[in-house]
Amino acid sequence: MKIINTVQEMQQITNELRASGKSIGFVPTMGYLHEGHATLLRKAREENEIVVLSVFVNPLQFGPNEDLDRYPRDIDRDENVAKENSVDYLFYPSVEEMYPAEQTTTVEVVKRTDVLCGKQRPGHFAGVAIVLMKLFNITLPTRAYFGMKDAQQVAVIEGFVADFNIPVTIVPVDIVREEDGLAKSSRNVYLSPEEREEALHLYRSLCIAKERIETGERNAEIITTLVKEYIETYTKGTVDYADLYAYPSLQVVDKIEGRIILAIAVKFDNVRLIDNITLTVK
């Protein structure tokens, strides 16, 4: 595995790889890699000749009161995970390397961002779109891999790739969970033992809702109320949202049909957790 720190060197390598006909699988991350990221890397390894991993904590996608400085970082750990999963190139640029001057151009995402996490994080998805536009141009991937834990991000990325005719296939990968059901997240390290136990009820609430839908419930409000009340009953967390939308359009639905997403965000003392399920309802 080779570690690359500059845009120029990474671009030169990927240009040469694509010119020689090699397929490139790209996994963009903010580091502190866990089994969820490793699953993306293994999928990329299976489907491509070359695997490129980026580790970059992108300041543009953090709001003024968000946890940029607290976001966990451990490049030694990340290198080990990369090597264990047969990564060919680890792209690890500094903020100054990625943003050497103030941006003169931005990307405004106008659909799929005014609900779920986007509703409470204005500018977040613009920051995501900017860094991905840069990373796609630097790494020239054939395929790029994203976890469905942030399903809204996947929907936004699929939309902006289609809008700008970016020649990359977006590959969504199912949420990776702990054995007890908790969705793997770099932020789980901030949970107290009590919160860690309570956090199990997030996925349980989604499973209960899924069972209700599969046994015939089609009223979206009944389902979201059930999820919210369950979480409020069994945890001390604050429910930011428990919402149901068509997916990937993220349009409001009253009647549950077609492909839908049921998504939740719950704030504990020091960490905000998200989770979701997607399913197709006939």
Curated annotation (Swiss-Prot):
Q: Which residue positions are annotated as catalytic?
A: 37 (proton donor)
Does ATP-binding appear among the keywords? yes
Q: Which domain of life is it from?
A: Bacteria
InterPro entries tied to this protein: Cyt_trans-like (IPR004821), Pantoate_ligase (IPR003721), Pantoate_ligase_C (IPR042176), Rossmann-like_a/b/a_fold (IPR014729)
Annotated positions binding ATP: 30-37, 147-150, 176, 184-187
CDD domains on file: PanC (cd00560)
Q: Key word Cytoplasm present in the record?
A: yes
GO BP annotation list: pantothenate biosynthetic process
The record's subcellular locations are:
Cytoplasm
Its catalytic activity?
A: (R)-pantoate + beta-alanine + ATP = (R)-pantothenate + AMP + diphosphate + H(+)
Where does this protein hold (R)-pantoate? 61, 153
Please list the GO terms describing molecular function: ATP binding; pantoate-beta-alanine ligase activity
Q: Per the UniProt record, which EC number(s) apply here?
A: 6.3.2.1
A family per Pfam: Pantoate_ligase
Q: Output a single Gene Ontology CC term carried by this record.
A: cytosol
- Residue numbers binding beta-alanine: 61
Q: Enumerate the Gene3D superfamilies for this protein.
A: HUPs, Pantoate-beta-alanine ligase, C-terminal domain
- Give UniProt keywords alphabetically: ATP-binding, Cytoplasm, Ligase, Nucleotide-binding, Pantothenate biosynthesis
Pathway noted in the entry = Cofactor biosynthesis; (R)-pantothenate biosynthesis; (R)-pantothenate from (R)-pantoate and beta-alanine: step 1/1
State how it assembles: Homodimer.
Q: What else is known?
A: The reaction proceeds by a bi uni uni bi ping pong mechanism.
**Family according to the record:** Belongs to the pantothenate synthetase family.
UniProt function note = Catalyzes the condensation of pantoate with beta-alanine in an ATP-dependent reaction via a pantoyl-adenylate intermediate.
Write the protein's name.
Pantothenate synthetase
Lineage here is: Bacteria, Bacillati, Bacillota, Bacilli, Bacillales
